Curated annotation (Swiss-Prot):
E.C. designation(s): 3.4.21.-
Mechanisms controlling activity: Inhibited by antipain and leupeptin.
Activity response to pH changes: Optimum pH is 4.0. Inactive below pH 3.0 and above pH 6.5. The half-life (t1/2) values for activity loss at 30 degrees Celsius are 150 minutes at pH 6.6, 5.5 minutes at pH 6.8 and 14 minutes at pH 2.4.
PROSITE patterns tied to this protein: SEDOLISIN
Localization per Swiss-Prot or TrEMBL: Secreted, Extracellular space
Organism: Aspergillus oryzae (strain ATCC 42149 / RIB 40)
Domain of life: Eukaryota
Temperature and thermostability: Remains fully active after heating at 50 degrees Celsius and pH 4.0 for 10 minutes. Retains 65% of its activity after heating at 55 degrees Celsius for 10 minutes. The half-life value for loss of activity at 60 degrees Celsius and pH 4.0 is 3.5 minutes.
Cofactor stoichiometry and binding remark: Binds 1 Ca(2+) ion per subunit.
Entry comment on modification after translation: N-glycosylated.
Protein name: Aorsin
Amino acid sequence: MRPLSHLSFFNGLLLGLSALSAATSVVHERREATSSNWVKRARVNPSDKHVVRIGLTQSSLEEAHDLLMDVSNPSSPNYARFYSADEVAAKFAPSTETVNEVQNWLTEKGINASRVAQTQNHGWLVFHATSKEIENLFDTTYYEYHNRKTGKKAIACEQYHVPASVQKHIDYVHPGVNLNPSSGKPSSIRRRAAASKKTKLPARGPRPIQQHDVKGLNVTNCDQLITPECIRALYKIPSARAAPHPNNSLGIFEEGDYYAQEDLDLFFKTFAKDIPQGTHPIPAFIDGAEAPVPVTKAGGESDLDFELAYPIVHPQSITLYQTDDANWASNTTGFLNTFLDALDGSYCTYCAYGECGNDPSLDPVYPDDAGYDGQLMCGVFKPTNVISVSYGEQENDLPANYQQRQCMEFLKLGLQGVSVLFASGDNGVAGPPGDGNSVNGCLNNGTVFSPAFPNSCPYITNVGATKVYPGYTVSQPESAVYDPDGLYSYASGGGFSNIYPIPDYQAEAVATYFKDHNPPYPYYEGAENLGKNGGLYNRLGRGYPDVAANGDNIAVFNGGEFGSSGGTSASTPIFASIINRIIDERLAVGKGPVGFINPVLYKNPSVLNDITNGTNPGCGTDGFSTAPGWDPATGLGTPNYPKMLKLWLDLP
């Protein structure tokens, strides 16, 4: 009987230890649903070996905003004292405590330190282990899954556990709950109903104009067509310095749209004779991208960007960040990750908000059997001081954590002194028609306003659009763009985020708008209450745009023909070019770039031309009205170059 007593005691001890273990471990991730494309097969073989990657929690995420404000706020003693790329990477690398805590846990579970490597960017611990070991490590069961459409295989679990004491140090585990194949193209590209992926702005033109109209164009008829002369007159832009700084090239992003040198030369010959024929951007081609193309294949976006920017910045150079091979550029749901990978090598494997590296179910995967056969390009290009992006999506198009990880990267670029500007969109308070599962591009069955992405990220500068109304001159105030003209219908994008709260640098301006010009619509507070009580917008969300510039009736050569175009994609390279010009003047007097410009502009709105006429309709409403000060149609207003230059020359 005594042996049985000992056995009973031993079993009781095991049960007690098991209960204690369960009490001190927690579910770290759980898959809530599995796509019908994935078929669960047999449990993995216990002796199979796998590469295990544990994404470590990054340091300084909570203080990241304060770090950026410290170098971006004009009142800060550290204004414009930017970090190097290595300093930023080190600042956000996992802490020594995080690495040690996770490594100690692995050792306790039989994964000795000699088996574990830390990646170069310090963000991952990587080791080889058998199925039996990782099931024991994560207190779970792994199964093989087969994708019935693609034939791809993956191993995954439905949930996994980590010790409660270690959980705060772990962001993500692979293999884990995600069913992403290790390589290959997604079986189904998630598309908008009316657009194949990213919105290339504009999507309306160009509208043909008779050739004889070209000869009669001058600053007196800018209400009919906007030429470089009109832009200089509107924003009081003088000629550029004859000897620009060699390290101050303007960056322009393009994807799936390509310029033609013939179009640029035609534009220079007609409107900018001081720019030599053959002038072209510096190539920074990412993951198999190529440019230029024959004039018969020229894209309206790329031609527009360069034809607007060159007359402002020349003889400064322009760098073209042409992104992704032709196959992926026209067949991807994700946005911007491969571009950011190329600027920051650590971003390729960077973990934040439960996202580690690119998402192969959304982003391009390289090598690409149908295109670029090289490896994903990581950290191969240095970011320019200013980057202009005339592309965008809507917040509801991609997962929130995908967007938040990306937004953090824009913050990091700001810490390095990079100014990133985005077009605010061309659909007023809505998304493109068909987006958001509604014909009008709105949320909740076509009623709730649809904020844009990445515009809602508080660490970029959003540019809305204005126009010179018929009969007005360049010396009179512009108005918010609204063209209700059928196929060419267009309104300056603006609204409030469902992901990000109002940033501190913007809080006073937004509060003033609500106090003095309260929109006549019901609202909700917080994305979790989307549409509640008939609310049309999030009263607590980050507002956009931040600024504006002309974006209508823009003169352009495209496909060898002269016409007009427009969109906030025209406004953005204009504003970005002006910032690049200002940086050139700062460099000439021994100062540096200006980095994230929003805090300076919100504290000094008088350097912009306030826009007080117009609205940005959408979702069956008039949208938001312009107003004195900031508004969600034209932001703080359009540039006044002399005032902006003086402001930034006076700053450190």
